[in-house]
């Protein structure tokens, strides 16, 4: 990861820091959009989706993992704050909102696809149907791409939205 390169830490150290419950609790107490959801069992990468993808200018000569994380979460705060009221009106957690956004982004070929995909998924959820997203199955399998086999759809994982209701 780029954070490992910039800080001089190993990728394992960065991931360990981002999975450390005491550190995550500090972040939960600092950022309005983080909650105990990221501490739930089965969450593969607690901060996934919360670290805003951007090119950051780092002026510190020896930045820490914590400083880099703060920069990314501060940027997430800036961008996500504009949707705060919308998220509340949907009766969704921020985690659910970001999960749905991630699925839509991966399912679509380009931004013009996103509203159509969102509409299909929202209709499925509102009708009590399974989400049935191939992307979530691939995520469960640790794969990228678009090809999903019948055997893949049998994967028993909470991320498999062909088997489990709601959002992963």
What are these regions (language model features)?
Residues 1-6:
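Membrane-embedded segments
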Residues 7-9, 23-168:
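Bacterial extracytoplasmic/cell-wall-associated proteins, especially those involved in peptidoglycan
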Residues 9-20:
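Extended intrinsically disordered, low-complexity coil regions enriched in Ser, Thr, Gly, Ala
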